[in-house]
Amino acid sequence: MTVNTQLNYQVYNWEGQVSGNADLNLKVSQDSGMYLVHRALVKQSNEKRQGSANTKTRSEVRGGGRKPWRQKGTGRARAGSIRSPLWRGGGVIFGPKPRSFTKKMNKKERQLALRTALNNKSVNTLIVENFNSYFHQPKTKLFMEAIHRWNLDLNKKVLVIVDKKDPNVYLSIRNLHNVELISADTLNIMALLAAHKIIITVDALSKIQEVYNG
């Protein structure tokens, strides 16, 4: 079951002062929201897995076609191949094989999980005016000063969501190991949940409303 929620934010300018207000209307899950968020997180985590682990069975290991000794009369245990899983250098029983760990999740469910996560993070979300025009060249110090004006702690993870990635902004933020920059159309559940604070530009907020509120 989904319910409509309206999130009201104060908008901060580059100097750290309140310059206006912004609203975000979201359809979020009321009952099973965290279950959907968990499924979306598992899906994204699984898609990062390479899935290339591979072992050889006794039929794939080189050699072992000849019976190592006769069946009876040697006093030793009977053996049919030196590549038996019981032998050193033999095949592996039920070992891993290359596989895909991808889990299926409907687009509507994924979007609902994202909206629910955004709603849950609303207390730790800061809306700011677009700041691309301040970066005429890459300058990390410029962004750090803005972070301090917005009263954010760089010792904790900060997620910055912009309308589209500006090369100068991206290069300025890249040096900060606790800050991640993503565009609104590549919003993902893992980045949202990992962030302690979320910064969203005004244009990115409009794009989130447009793209994910289906």
From Swiss-Prot:
GO terms for biological process: translation. Residues 42-81 are annotated as: Disordered. It is found in: Plastid, Chloroplast. It holds the Pfam family Ribosomal_L4. It comes from the Eukaryota. GO terms for cellular component: chloroplast; ribonucleoprotein complex; ribosome. Gene3D superfamilies: 3.40.1370.10. Residues 64-75 have a biased composition (Basic residues). Keywords: Chloroplast, Plastid, Ribonucleoprotein, Ribosomal protein, RNA-binding, rRNA-binding. One of its GO terms (molecular function) is structural constituent of ribosome. Its main location: plastid. Belongs to the universal ribosomal protein uL4 family. Part of the 50S ribosomal subunit. Probably binds the 23S rRNA. This is Large ribosomal subunit protein uL4c. The lineage of its organism: Eukaryota, Rhodophyta, Bangiophyceae, Bangiales, Bangiaceae.
